């Protein structure tokens, strides 16, 4: 089986086969562009902070505020992670930090939203359990489809093709 199957671990066999067919037939770019024609405009740490804070205020009003949010180079990220959520205690106050892979700086907004929602869900649920995914779906009703499309986007990146990169 293709080494791209690792992106789709845990998915039903028919979904994995469809995804691998898209990859093998070089159709991932076409699929993504037809579904998500434009990249988002969140292209700085400040804009990411504003974007993530607005989602947090809308869905997680009672959770503590962010300390920081920013894009990080892959070398600065945990292996194979597109995003990380960390928190630290300062006295009695908990500070949350979000780090999103800089690969997502040039991606469609729904895929960025899926990743930010995923990291925000860790504010309440530390583990990837039913409650965690229920919270993700509360914040993004189409979360499961977005997560699958995000995995296709990652496969496209590993092929060296970002359909949304802004070439100069």
PLM ranges: what are they?
Residues 119:
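Walker B catalytic acidic pair
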């Amino acid at each position: 089986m293709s080494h791209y199957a690792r992106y789709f671990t845990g998915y039903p066999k028919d979904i994995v086969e469809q995804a691998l067919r898209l990859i093998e037939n070089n159709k991932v770019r076409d699929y993504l562009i037809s579904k998500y024609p434009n990249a988002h405009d969140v292209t700085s740490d400040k804009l990411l902070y504003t974007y993530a804070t607005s989602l947090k205020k809308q869905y997680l009003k009672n959770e503590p505020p962010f300390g920081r949010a920013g894009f990080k180079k892959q070398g600065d990220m945990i292996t194979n992670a597109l995003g990380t959520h960390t928190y630290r205690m300062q006295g009695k106050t908990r500070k949350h930090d979000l780090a999103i892979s800089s690969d997502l700086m040039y991606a469609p907004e729904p895929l960025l939203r899926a990743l930010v929602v995923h990291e925000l869900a860790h504010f309440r649920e530390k583990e990837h359990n039913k409650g965690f995914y229920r919270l993700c779906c509360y914040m993004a009703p189409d979360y499961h489809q977005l997560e699958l499309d995000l995995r296709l986007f990652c496969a496209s990146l590993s092929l060296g093709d970002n359909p949304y990169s802004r070439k100069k």
